[in-house]
């Protein structure tokens, strides 16, 4: 069964939006959102052009993983707004957010999944 890339990206985007709404969190607040949003933005921006082309889809996934990694790394310069780290927000500057690492790993895992784990075209 073929995966509808545009629908999959839409579902991922909706999921991240739901997370932001439920957690009352936005990018720049030193959370998993700081990795997820850049990855989803790359996917949203390239899904239509890559759809149906396995090579272009793989490249798009790699680009999304790179964007998520950059978003995660950017949390080092942010002050924590949520969770226990927010109690000593100034001390959180210079420390990588653990949640953002999870977001980075999600995108890295998707991008590095062997092609044979995906449906045949």
Residue map of PLM features:
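N-terminal loops that bind phosphate or other acidic moieties
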Residues: 1-121
